Amino acid sequence: MKKNDIRLYNVLFPIWFLFLFPQLWLIMLPANFVIDSLVVSLSALRQKLEHPFTLWRKSILPIWIIGFASDLIGAGLTVLLFYGFGILGRLGIEIPNLILFPGTPLISIPGLILAGFLIYFLNRTFSFRSSALDAQQIHKLCLHLALWTAPYTMLIPLYG
C-alpha cells in the first residue's frame, strides 16, 4: 500500500449493538450512507472518472441498500456459526474454547468475508448498470466498496 492511500472502514456496523439499542438504526442508516458516498466519490476521483457526481447520484441508493443488506447477511452467517458450534458442543463434539468464546473474531471471519463478497458481486451486478463505465472501472469501484465498507466491527468481541 502506498503511503498516501486512504482507507475508510465501515466501522458503524456492530450488529449486536443495534439489537441492544434499536434507536441507533436512525443513526446507522445515514452514517452508512455517508461512508458509502465517501468511498464511491473518492474512488471515482482517484480513477479520474468523468462526471463523478452523476455517477454518485445514479448509483448511491443501490450501493447503500446492497451494503446494508450484505452486512446483515454476513452478521446472520456469524450468528448461525456461533449457534451451530454451540449445538455441536452440546452433542459431545469437542470444539476448542477459543472458537466458542462469544463474539470471537474467529467465528466472525466467514461473515466478514461473505459480506465483502456480496458487496462486491451485487454492486458489480446492479449498482452501475446505468453508468457508461467499462468493466475495469466498475471492477475497481466495486473492489473499493467491498474492501473499505466491509463490516470490520464484526471482529470486535462482545465482551471479554
Q: Residue ranges of each PLM-predicted region?
A:
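Juxtamembrane/disordered regions of integral membrane proteins
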Residues: 1-160
